[in-house]
């Protein structure tokens, strides 16, 4: 057989190789017949080893091709292997790209994309700009593969203005390019820009793809646009994207959870075939945050029955449910599960256990967990201060605050929320004012919504309703719903019925979908024996489709 025919035969056999063993057998024949330095066979061997996830063999095969014989195809083959490999770092890709530039004339869209992605991974914007210039020089900056990579590079490393400029200069834009730009705006929390781009893309007549829908549904979750999110879900079903992308399914579930549409989230979750730990955790966390703790526990048990191992985030979420239920037994069972399965506790878990034990009334166990921590940061100290506070142990909370400072841990915004909450639970108005003034003067912590709400709660609990109302009216920022909510709760305690009606109106103008305001106002009128007003409020609830949920508790006594 002529050498050319023999080489072609080996290429055919190599293209049919299915396993690493088959590839090595063909490689042996290539060596025997002296074809190892041939660029076509060498490149094909390199690719075959890459497909078998043996980058070491691929590199060895590539290196046996003489430098003067290597062409763009052979360089792109090895570059693709390094780019896709989980064992190599971005610096290896960039080093290989620089070697190619020294030994091979010209560039193409493939090796430019590999180099740009490596620059993004390494955070090398200046190198990326040089590659952008090279792409422009070779007329490839508007290529269907290169352009999205450049937009992503500027979105990740530069500014969205730069990314938008590159995007605007591209005359023909495909759906990938639109999706990459939307993804960039999502990173910078510019959700309105995502909606704007979607409308512009739709007007061009381009078909939507999974990336576009994922960006759109994430933006819906960020701004709590549940109705729009439902429409996106509908589109993804009609165009069959929902069955093709697990990530899209997970994103829609996350959107429903953020919008508190938990029943919609669970319905989609139940139809998902590949339910991974992220999906389980998202749903469990959603039920826990919405105080539907029993359902969160049911999901957690179902997760374990299906042999899905929980991660640290799952366990932190289920501990929120333990706190919500006030169930020490459930909390201890989770603690025991972690110990039995050798799961190491991180700072988040330690803090979650402190909070859970404190809310279940076992302050001694909360303190034990705190003492077990190998390292204590400002979050763990703040959590312990809060633990003392919610159990009415103000002196211990204040002592913990002073100990934290003695350990050179600087209090932050969360610390003062915990401390002001402790003042509120103990009714210590004087100390509350002292700490509120100190936080800015001594520590540079600017009061936020939660700090103002704590002060309103403190004054309200102490019966200083007028001063609490005056405090809200004179706040340097626009009062948020949490501050008005704290005052409404105080109105119930101190039977300030007229003021309660006024505050409820303000709250409903800010959060018209919040049914808990109607429930609290109804209870205030009921406490005052104003049954006509109770019926009036409940009729409004009925018109809006709200109903009073029966509370669930597992608080243990004895």
Swiss-Prot record:
Protein name, UniProt field: Pentatricopeptide repeat-containing protein At1g06140, mitochondrial
Superkingdom to which the source organism belongs: Eukaryota
Molecular function per GO: RNA binding
Family under the similarity heading: Belongs to the PPR family. PCMP-E subfamily.
Subcellular location(s) per record: Mitochondrion
Source species: Arabidopsis thaliana
Matches recorded under Pfam families: E_motif, PPR, PPR_2
A GO cellular component annotation in the UniProt record: mitochondrion
Transit peptide: 1-79
Gene coding for it: PCMP-E61
Predominant localisation class: mitochondrion
UniProt-listed PANTHER family: PENTATRICOPEPTIDE REPEAT-CONTAINING PROTEIN
GO biological process: mitochondrial mRNA modification
């Amino acid at each position: 057989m002529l050498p050319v025919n023999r080489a072609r035969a080996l290429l055919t056999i190599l293209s049919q190789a299915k396993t690493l063993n088959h590839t090595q057998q063909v490689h042996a024949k290539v060596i025997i017949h002296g074809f190892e330095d041939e660029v076509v066979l060498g490149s094909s061997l390199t690719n075959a080893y890459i497909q078998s996830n043996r980058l070491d063999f691929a590199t060895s095969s590539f290196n046996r091709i003489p430098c003067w014989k290597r062409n763009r195809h052979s360089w792109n083959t090895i570059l693709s292997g390094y780019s896709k490999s989980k064992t190599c770092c971005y610096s290896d890709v960039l080093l290989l790209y620089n070697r190619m530039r020294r030994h091979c004339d010209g560039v193409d869209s493939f090796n430019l994309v590999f180099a740009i992605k490596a620059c993004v991974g390494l955070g090398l914007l200046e190198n990326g700009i040089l590659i952008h210039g090279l792409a422009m020089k070779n007329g490839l900056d508007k290529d269907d593969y290169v352009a999205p990579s450049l937009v992503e590079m500027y979105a990740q490393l530069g500014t969205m203005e730069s990314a938008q400029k590159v995007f605007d200069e591209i005359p023909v834009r495909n759906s990938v390019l639109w999706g990459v730009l939307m993804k960039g705006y999502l990173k910078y929390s510019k959700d309105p820009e995502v909606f704007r781009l979607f409308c512009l893309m739709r007007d061009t007549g381009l078909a939507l793809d999974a990336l576009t829908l994922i960006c759109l549904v994430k933006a819906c979750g960020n701004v709590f646009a549940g109705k729009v999110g439902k429409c996106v879900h509908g589109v993804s079903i009609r165009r069959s994207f929902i069955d093709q992308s697990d990530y899209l399914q997970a994103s829609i579930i996350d959107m429903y959870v953020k919008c508190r549409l938990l029943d919609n989230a669970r319905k989609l979750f139940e139809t998902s075939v590949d339910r991974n730990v992220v999906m389980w955790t998202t749903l469990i966390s959603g039920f826990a945050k919405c105080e539907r703790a029993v359902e969160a526990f049911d999901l957690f048990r179902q997760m374990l029955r299906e042999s899905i191992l929980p991660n640290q985030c799952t366990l932190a979420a289920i501990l929120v449910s333990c706190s919500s239920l006030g169930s020490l037994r459930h909390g201890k069972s989770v603690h025991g599960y972690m110990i039995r399965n050798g799961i190491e506790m991180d700072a988040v878990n330690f803090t979650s256990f402190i909070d859970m034990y404190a809310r279940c009334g076992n302050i001694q166990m909360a303190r034990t967990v705190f003492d077990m921590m190998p390292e204590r940061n400002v979050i763990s100290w703040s959590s312990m201060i809060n633990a003392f506070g919610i159990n009415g142990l103000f002196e211990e909370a204040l002592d913990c605050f002073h100990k934290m400072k003695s350990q050179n841990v600087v209090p932050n915004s969360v610390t003062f929320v915990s401390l002001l909450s402790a003042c509120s639970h103990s009714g210590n108005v004087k100390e509350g004012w002292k700490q509120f003034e100190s936080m800015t003067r001594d520590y540079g912590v600017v009061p936020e919504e939660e700090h103002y709400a704590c002060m309103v709660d403190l004054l309200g609990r102490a019966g200083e309703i007028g001063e609490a109302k005056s405090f809200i009216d004179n706040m340097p920022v626009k009062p948020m719903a949490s501050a008005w909510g704290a005052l409404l709760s105080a109105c119930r305690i101190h039977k300030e019925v007229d003021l309660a009606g006024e505050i409820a109106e303000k709250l409903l103008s800010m959060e018209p979908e919040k049914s808990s305001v109607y429930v609290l106002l109804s209870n205030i009128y009921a406490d005052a024996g104003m049954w006509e007003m109770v019926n009036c409020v409940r009729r409004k609830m009925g018109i809006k489709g709200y109903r009073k949920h029966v509370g669930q508790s597992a608080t243990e006594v004895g």
